[in-house]
């Protein structure tokens, strides 16, 4: 991939605006660090530009809260093309999605949508465990590019958690709504699917993910009792 790509540059700008003011859970680290790391992992693994861009954009739509009028205002202030888009949450999301398809193509947006969790159905908030089981089920039949994107996403999350545990201890797991054993179950499940199904040069991501999840399991061993840390299935991130 070229050292500079106008498409990658635009994707970074959109992600920076979309994640403005957001931080990584339990930290003061700007959230934009996550999609940038995910994109870098994908690039290093040899994935093509559409997949790298999907890594940059993978959380933009998922994290666009329906009642976040301020986020919609930020998008309009930076991107004049959104001036004519409806201001209601549904209309704005549809307009932004249409623009992303126009600028980055169906392939990139199909990848983004494949890893975007549906947090609500008919106005009902979905339980954490329900969403994660669905995500794992989708991976069982996903194509290589989707598996690579998911592996890079989870790999950076696990690496970040391990670094935070090294710095501040396993107590940092309390920042998550899911219990430590639920979190580890989900990451292990993703690693197992990717390990079985991700082939070619991108299989290195699956190997790194497997090692990272193993390191997380070691870091958490003996610190949490599954019988007391399990939370209800309504746990959400």
Q: What are these model-derived regions, one by one?
A:
Residues 1-237:
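Active-site helical microenvironments for divalent-metal-assisted chemistry
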